[in-house]
């Protein structure tokens, strides 16, 4: 009962839109915000919160961070090891016996990692990195007059201050990137909206850097759109985003339903608000930002003339001549002379209908942290502040937020729950410890989580809202988000089969539900044999000529990925081993065609390019696993041998591997300047061992590095960022340093049980 009371208090504390009259005044609504701010510390917010009062609430895989201002609630809801770990607080764990073998290191790692398992059975983590995610949430809050609790505002300020570039004070596209106009414009705006004064030294420094880069007129398309929504910029600076495209017949080769899921879900709310030229209520803060963000007087800016103005460091993917021509025609001919209101009204109505279907399919969570806040603003503009959809969106926006030792950030989605849990299970399996009773309670909880998170039905009217079949699938995060992904289905399915075929574990997911997952997986193969992520490609790479984002590459359509292809191949192979009579010919054909594509995707240097992890090391690990699944290894396969030789050529003197995120951008292997990384080292070792690479001494050197990096309490420390999307933006997978590292150690221990390494 006490825990329920504490949880209720915490739940109330994490709903900024529902702040009671007794709570603090909203920091970003009225024109007298600055007057309110001066009554508090400099900047209108506190210096810091009390980290002993933060709790991460896990409700069936839904994460919300709670700040307990009530002392009774504080006593009733103690911090867990996971809370303290996420917040960077001391864990005061005892030192474990020093590992004398790789298997000892796995056990020590599991001793630590088990303490981070959450009540619903999964492992949480921050999924940060991109520096444009938090602005999406905060700018949407401000535009919709959503109260921002002081503890959110305080830790937002702390996080952005911590992540400012140490030399120029700006912000980049992601946490390890160079300062950009995109990152600096949006994050400077966030700080002003949460109450930081313009004359704060850090703001003065950031503003000077922004002005040196040309000011906000030199920002990319997405930033200009957000500034127009706030009323900080005029809508004329935004290139056309016509919702009429949603009215095109499906047969049109560039119709939006053919675009990659993330870009079409961003284009949807963008087009709705662009069409309406809606802007938030003007405040003193908005008027001040008009002076702070631009190098010219606001009234003298040629807004239309700056539609295509962009700083070179933001212009990762320059707009094509074709898109520039289309934009010119839409802005100068179609919009002023031929755009008729009945058609625009119809387009806006259909766009809103698609947003409403997204709400229904995700319970107002939406696909991710960019489209969700954008949809919130659309719903607010459409129906006002009191509709259920607006209130529910505001509640669920909290699930995108995360608190770490630096402050409050926004995750790339609402989490990595199913993905990380699947890898955690496989880690124990690869070490040969699934039958060890010591780890059975942990594994059973993980299995129960995957049981709970399997998606049991397809989306309502899935063809109407352009969704892929998903019955029997798993999402990247949780079933509320509900977007099936080929590799997420595959890794979760493998983990379920592994445990349910292990003596002592119950069969929670029956055969029919397993078959449902297989039926859905079999819909993911592309004509060339490969697999993509959310759905098979619906248009070709030529669509990148319409890429308006400027800061991203490979964003307009789905692409083929060796990582996703491998995951599906290995899942189908494992399934076929246990259910040989279910759709055997289709599965065999799928696997053969997929592995054949893997071979064609190999690069001249022997590696594979990774799109979801950094970079060649990541993809080569998966590709070698694909080849091994059909019996092709270093000894008998030219492709496997070339892949291994590529990895070995990158091994460092200390035995590790060290790939920098620049490899994703340049397409060439780039060494990380800080030296070997445990995650990259683990990926390389896993790939080599999957391929039966024969030189044990090379493997031992890498394993030795992993063991030496392990801390006395069993953990590994965070190193460089691990993940990537759209070639140019990096994203964090902090649990990889546990799951893949223990997997590599466990595989070595099983392969060479008598080799103690140290």
Label every PLM stretch briefly.
Residues 1-758:
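Preference for long, amphipathic alpha-helical scaffolds in soluble/luminal domains
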């Amino acid at each position: 009962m006490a825990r329920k009371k504490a949880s209720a208090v915490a739940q109330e504390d994490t709903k900024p839109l529902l702040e009671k009259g007794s709570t603090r005044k909203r920091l970003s609504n009225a024109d007298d915000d600055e007057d309110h701010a001066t009554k508090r510390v400099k900047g209108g917010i506190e210096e810091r919160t009390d980290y002993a009062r933060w709790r991460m609430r896990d409700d069936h895989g839904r994460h919300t961070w709670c700040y307990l201002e009530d002392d009774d609630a504080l006593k009733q809801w103690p911090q867990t090891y996971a809370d303290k770990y996420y917040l960077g607080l001391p864990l005061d764990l005892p030192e474990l016996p020093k590992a004398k073998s790789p298997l000892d290191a796995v056990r020590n790692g599991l001793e630590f990692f088990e303490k981070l398992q959450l009540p619903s059975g999964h492992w949480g983590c921050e999924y940060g990195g991109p520096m444009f995610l938090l602005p999406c949430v905060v700018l949407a809050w401000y535009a919709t007059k959503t109260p921002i609790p002081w503890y959110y505002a305080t830790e937002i300020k702390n996080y952005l201050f911590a992540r400012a570039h140490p030399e120029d004070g700006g912000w980049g596209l992601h946490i390890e990137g160079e300062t950009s106009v995109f990152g600096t414009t949006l994050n400077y705006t966030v700080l002003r909206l949460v109450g930081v004064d313009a004359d704060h030294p850090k703001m003065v420094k950031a503003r000077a850097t922004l002005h040196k880069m040309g000011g906000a007129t030199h920002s990319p398309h997405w930033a200009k759109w957000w500034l127009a929504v706030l009323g900080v910029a005029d809508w004329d600076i935004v290139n056309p985003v016509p919702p009429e495209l949603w009215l095109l017949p499906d047969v049109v080769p560039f119709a939006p339903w053919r675009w990659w899921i993330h870009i079409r879900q961003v284009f949807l709310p963008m087009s709705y608000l662009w069409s309406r030229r809606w802007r938030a209520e003007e405040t003193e803060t908005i008027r001040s930002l008009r002076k702070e963000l631009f190098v010219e007087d606001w009234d003298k800016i040629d807004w239309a003339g700056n539609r295509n103005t962009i700083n070179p460091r933001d212009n990762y993917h320059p707009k094509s001549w074709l898109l520039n021509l289309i934009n010119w025609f839409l802005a100068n001919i179609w919009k002023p002379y031929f755009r008729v209101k009945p058609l625009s009204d119809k387009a806006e109505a259909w766009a809103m209908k698609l947003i409403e279907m997204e709400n229904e399919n995700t319970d107002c969570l939406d696909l991710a942290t960019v489209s969700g806040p954008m949809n919130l603003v659309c719903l607010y503009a459409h129906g006002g502040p009191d509709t259920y959809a607006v209130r529910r969106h505001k509640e669920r926006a909290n699930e995108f937020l995360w608190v770490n030792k630096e402050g409050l950030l926004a995750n790339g989605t609402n989490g990595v729950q199913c993905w990380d849990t699947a890898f955690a299970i496989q880690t124990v399996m690869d070490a040969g410890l699934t039958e060890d009773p010591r780890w059975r309670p942990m594994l059973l909880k993980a299995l129960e989580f995957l049981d709970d998170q399997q998606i049991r039905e397809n989306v309502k009217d899935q063809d109407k809202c352009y969704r892929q079949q998903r019955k029997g699938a798993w999402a990247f995060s949780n079933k509320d988000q509900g977007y099936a992904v080929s590799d997420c289905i595959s890794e979760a399915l493998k983990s379920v089969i592994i445990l349910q075929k292990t003596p002592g574990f119950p069969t929670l997911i029956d055969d029919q539900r397993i078959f449902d997952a297989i039926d859905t997986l079999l819909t993911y193969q592309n004509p060339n044999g490969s697999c993509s992520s959310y759905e098979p490609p619906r248009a070709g790479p030529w669509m990148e000529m319409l890429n308006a984002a400027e800061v991203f590459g490979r964003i307009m359509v789905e692409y083929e990925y060796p990582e996703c292809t491998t995951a599906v191949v290995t899942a189908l192979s494992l399934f076929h081993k246990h259910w040989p009579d279910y759709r055997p010919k289709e599965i065999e054909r799928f696997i053969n065609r997929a592995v054949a594509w893997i071979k064609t995707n190999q690069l001249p240097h022997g590696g594979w390019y990774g799109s979801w992890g950094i970079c060649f090391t990541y993809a080569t690990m998966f590709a070698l696993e694909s080849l091994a699944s059909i019996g092709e290894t270093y000894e008998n396969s030219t492709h496997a041998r070339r892949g291994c030789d590529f990895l070995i050529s990158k091994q460092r003197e200390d035995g590790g591997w060290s790939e920098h995120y620049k490899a994703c951008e340049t397409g060439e292997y780039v060494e990380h300047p800080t030296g070997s990384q445990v995650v990259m080292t683990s990926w390389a070792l896993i790939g080599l061992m999957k391929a039966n690479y024969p030189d044990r001494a090379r493997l031992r050197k890498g394993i030795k590095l992993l063991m030496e990096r392990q801390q006395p309490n069993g953990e590994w420390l965070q190193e460089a960022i691990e993940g990537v999307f759209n070639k140019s933006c990096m994203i964090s997978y902090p649990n990889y340093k546990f799951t893949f590292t223990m997997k590599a150690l466990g595989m070595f221990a099983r392969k060479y049980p008598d080799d103690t390494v140290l």
